[in-house]
């Protein structure tokens, strides 16, 4: 899948994860999101580029994989984020930042074929678009620490 399509999938996943509170059915959440996606604004109020155009199937599948992966591994993911976010509890974090961190942490754990630098850079870029001015450095710092523990560089 092209990198632009993966970015779109990540952005869609962030929007779904943002509304996930750890309870209820992930499948119901996905169904609700995709049914709302046809409107002119998405769940965060962002205007859709073309609200009449359906999401490409590979993009949708990638987004759903990320969402399901976060939901299935939420306790582990939140544990890692909490462990490596010095002086920040998950409850104090901005919800957008937490959604980005959850998605990227899952990708670090579950998508070993994607380079660490790509995962972190994508999270930072999405943070620039949806978060505050502090989001990119906040997300970068936590994901860097998580990646050093969960995805150490193998010496050759």
UniProtKB/Swiss-Prot annotation:
Protein's GO biological process: DNA-templated transcription termination; transcription antitermination
List the CDD domains hit by this protein, alphabetically. Answer: Terminator_NusB (cd00619)
Keywords per UniProt: RNA-binding, Transcription, Transcription antitermination, Transcription regulation
SUPFAM superfamilies from the entry?
NusB-like
InterPro entries in UniProt: NusB-like_sf, NusB_fam, NusB_RsmB_TIM44
Q: Which GO terms describe its cellular component?
A: cytosol
Recorded GO molecular functions are: RNA binding
Report the SS bond pairs.
none
Task: State the function annotated in the UniProt record.
Answer: Involved in transcription antitermination. Required for transcription of ribosomal RNA (rRNA) genes. Binds specifically to the boxA antiterminator sequence of the ribosomal RNA (rrn) operons.
Q: To which protein family does this belong? A: Belongs to the NusB family.
The record's annotation in NCBIfam families points to: nusB (TIGR01951)
Protein name, UniProt field: Transcription antitermination protein NusB
The species is Syntrophotalea carbinolica (strain DSM 2380 / NBRC 103641 / GraBd1)
Gene (UniProt): nusB
């Amino acid at each position: 899948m092209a990198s632009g399509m993966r970015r779109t999938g990540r952005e869609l996943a962030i929007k779904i994860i943002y509304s996930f509170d750890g309870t209820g059915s992930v499948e119901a959440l996905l169904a609700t999101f995709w049914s709302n996606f046809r409107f002119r604004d998405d769940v965060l109020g962002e205007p859709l580029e073309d609200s009449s155009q359906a999401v490409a199937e590979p993009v949708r599948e990638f987004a759903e994989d990320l969402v399901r992966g976060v939901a299935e591994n939420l306790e582990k993911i939140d544990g890692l984020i909490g462990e490596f976010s010095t002086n920040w509890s998950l409850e104090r974090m901005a919800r957008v930042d937490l959604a980005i961190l959850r998605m990227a942490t899952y990708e670090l754990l579950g998508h070993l074929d994607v380079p660490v630098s790509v995962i972190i850079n994508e999270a930072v870029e999405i943070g620039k678009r949806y978060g505050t001015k502090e989001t990119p450095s906040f997300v970068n710092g936590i994901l860097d620490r998580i990646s050093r523990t969960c995805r150490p560089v193998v010496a050759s």
